[in-house]
């Protein structure tokens, strides 16, 4: 398995630093021992800079989402207003084919001028070209063995170009991303 990568300013960069186990241990202590596998899996793909840029409350929300997505909630969307319409949007959601395109398209259509992004997945590197049917078979096998679904944790920064209040804009964005995630979770391929 290759080294994890994250996307920053359009360049895939290797993640050479790791999240300290003490952070994972603190999060598991708050969520319960049954969360250890899901939390460790999610945080194993994050760079320490991603973690350092996140507040303790945000880290707890991401850890909780690692346990709850998609069984209890379709996805977690966190929008933080930085200044003068600049926002940071962080998404924890199930991993599925073409998700990056769907998310960035929705962000753009919602009025976010994306300036940078970090993209992480617990799925590891793609095994090469797979058909949609192959992906569905792999998911069915994972489901039958009880293996947790792969997750993404993506962070985008940019400027909201609509005239809407940021809180109103964020509420609409959260609902739209949840709707898209619910549609993908149905896993109904076209033409079958």
Where are these predicted regions, by residue range?
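Non-catalytic interaction/regulatory segments
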Residues: 1-192
